[in-house]
Amino acid sequence: MSLLHIAVILPLIFALIIPILYRFFKRIHLGWFVLPVPIVIFIYMLTLIKTTMSGNTVMKTLNWMPHFGMNFDLYLDGLGLLFSLLISGIGSLVVLYSIGYLSKSEQLGNFYCYLLLFMGAMLGVVLSDNVIILYLFWELTSFSSFLLISFWRERQASIYGAQKSLIITVFGGLSLLGGIILLAIPTQSFSIQYMIQHASEIQNSPFFIFAMILIMIGAFTKSAQFPFYIWLPDAMEAPTPVSAYLHSATMVKAGLYLIARMTPIFAASQGWVWTVTLVGLITLFWASLNATKQQDLKGILAFSTVSQLGMIMAMLGIGAISYHYQGDDSKIYAAAFTAAIFHLINHATFKGALFMITGAVDHSTGTRDVKKLGGLLTIMPISFTITVITALSMAGVPPFNGFLSKESFLETTFTASQANLFSVDTLGYLFPIIGIVGSVFTFVYSIKFIMHIFFGQYKPEQLPKKAHEVSILMLLSPAILATLVIVFGLFPGILTNSIIEPATSSINHTVIDDVEFHMFHGLTPAFLSTLVIYILGILLIVTFSYWVKLLQRQPGKLTFNYWYNRSANVIPNYSEKMTNSYVTDYSRNNLVIIFGALILLTFVTIFSVPFNINFKDVSPIRIFEVCIVILLLSAAFLILFAKSRLFSIIMLSAVGYAVSVLFIFFKAPDLALTQFVVESISTALFLLCFYHLPNLNRYNEKRSFQLTNALIAGGVGLSVIIIGLIAYGNRHFESISKFYQEHVYDLAHGKNMVNVILVDFRGMDTLFESSVLGIAGLAVYTMIKLRKKRQTQGNEVKNHE
């Protein structure tokens, strides 16, 4: 196993160990045991920077099911390294922050188990080369995030937010699964790199458009893009460390990673360019507009996150244009990839810090309601400093890193509007307009975020707690991120050669070696647009109290949340009615539906899939076998038309004993003896229960009732026979029976093959089966004891009365 595999598996292993440590070390905060895990992974990833800088990649394989083309393949290039550093680096700071945020009285064992589970899943997503493995980790991120969001499960809002996120992201996961299967059909491979190398085969496939749509749905749901963004604001009910980790730096960026990774395959389609770009721009505008009217600090950051993700998504869409040009022209549009990567890093720094500061304010005052907050400037000066740095970066104000990436974003929108491709040169003028409008609202909510908390009147009577500055443990992580905001803004070259260029080359597959970011490029359209953004933003802030009321009056029916909630109520009701229409309290009717569907499915498959039945090696049928089969069929037929319960029991036993005799003729005395014992016990139990069984009513005597039973029984029997013959005649693997014949005596020192298989080769299976029987027996015994106890208590009450 390689170090890369260990890096992915390490958090998963610790996720199993941490709950055990929690039981024995309750005096020490569990976070201190968790903190080394992401730090070690982060340090290991740092050692791989030189590898990706030189244009090399790391490919490691761990065999799993090689015959089916499914191995635990990990592939690390510049893009995978970037995300791995974010996952482990931000993860380290989040764990450190959580030590101060969560008290020892919380269920820390569960929390850190879920957090490490998510960390390992995210690393698996960004490093997997096998799309099936990627999908498994993808769904694991949804599952673990569900557990983290619902961590405070006593809150109804937490349960609601967790369910909504799970439903939407799992829907996207199923779409992703469909997409990757359609990708694998033309290439006959599950390797992402192989698919990229054979992208032309996929593009010529009839499944290309369908695969592209399904992949985009999977990415859009994960990254909370329009119209799937509604799950993210409700996910803010999670503890603040979860929000800072999942919803700013990791999970919500999994969709961006997927779009970036799949761009070499789908960039040839104008549908990909237009859809990814427009969805990103619409998300940017809509979410930034909604962020301005939020009354909860986390609500502001939630919609802010959605808008910033939309900005990055739009840049990835614009960058796809580079695949349609060569040379320097290609590099012009590939600059959008560079801007997307840079802003992805910047967003993780300032948004992670802002989430942590929000948690600090909530921890200090007991509320996140902007109507109750204000005037905390002198009470929380350190938090104020960190907030100003990171919020101004989010607003795109120099000299912070957010200004550089925002300028790059505006430049890419102007550049894209000039592309003579896919009608972008005519309709592309919308790109900079939407980008500027979205940036104006981004500026507004960023400045208002600072003002809501630290300026205005201090209202101690409305605060659940007396406000105070939080501990150093809660300030250290956001302070580190705020420092990075300044450093990356003043010295972006630290990132360009080591991180941004290799990551961009992984998407564009061309050598990107001239990436530069500057605070001032001259009087460019992007710079002039920035001045317009500042002016309009200040005007909107001054008039904020007037126009924000119009936004807050938005009718509920015009929101996607309204339709989600309505669907969540209507669909279960219709499902219940539909289920009740065919599922009854009469088990016979339920079995008719189940077996009828099985028969229909079997025969549809038989007539639609080519097969052959081979009778070459079938043993000859002897006369006494025919006699036993006739006896067996006669008994089974009589059961269907029996008029008494006793006669049915006798005939059913006759069928079982006839099968036992067949086993004897087939030289399987052990099976025959077992069948004989089972039938004897079953018959005895039936006779013991005979007194309590209801009589066969007139409904059972109806001819239609009996004919239906006969058809279903015969159909199931025929289906099993046909499936058995087809399986016998269409063997794709060598029979395992030869292995048992050769090794039964050598390995197990037994001559009875059946006994040896059951006791030795499949001993654990037999043990568990016996355990299940034992548990079932204990359950029946317990139920009988409880019934007797209740009867005794009832008699005592009657005697007392």
From Swiss-Prot:
Note whether Cell division occurs among the keywords.
no
> Which InterPro entries does its entry note?
CPA3_Na-H_Antiporter_A, MrpA/MnhA1/PhaAB, MrpA_C/MbhD, MrpA_C/MbhE, ND/Mrp_TM, Proton_antipo_N
Assembly behavior: May form a heterooligomeric complex that consists of seven subunits: mnhA1, mnhB1, mnhC1, mnhD1, mnhE1, mnhF1 and mnhG1.
Instruction: Please provide one cellular component term from the Gene Ontology annotations of this protein.
Output: plasma membrane
The known regulators of its activity are described as:
Na(+) extrusion is completely inhibited by the H(+) conductor carbonyl cyanide m-chlorophenylhydrazone (CCCP).
Q: What is the taxonomic lineage of the source species?
A: Bacteria, Bacillati, Bacillota, Bacilli, Bacillales
Entry-linked NCBIfam families: 2a6301s01, PRK12645.1
Gene Ontology BP annotations:
proton transmembrane transport; sodium ion transport
Protein's job:
Mnh complex is a Na(+)/H(+) antiporter involved in Na(+) excretion.
| Gene name of the record | mnhA1
Q: Name one GO molecular function term.
A: antiporter activity
Q: Topology versus the membrane, per the UniProt entry?
A: Multi-pass membrane protein
Provide the alphabetized UniProt keywords: Antiport, Cell membrane, Hydrogen ion transport, Ion transport, Membrane, Sodium, Sodium transport, Transmembrane, Transmembrane helix, Transport
Q: What is its main location?
A: membrane
Q: What is this protein called?
A: Na(+)/H(+) antiporter subunit A1
Transmembrane residue ranges? 4-25, 30-49, 79-101, 108-127, 131-153, 166-188, 208-230, 243-265, 270-289, 302-324, 339-361, 373-395, 429-451, 472-494, 526-548, 589-611, 621-641, 646-668, 672-694, 707-729, 767-784
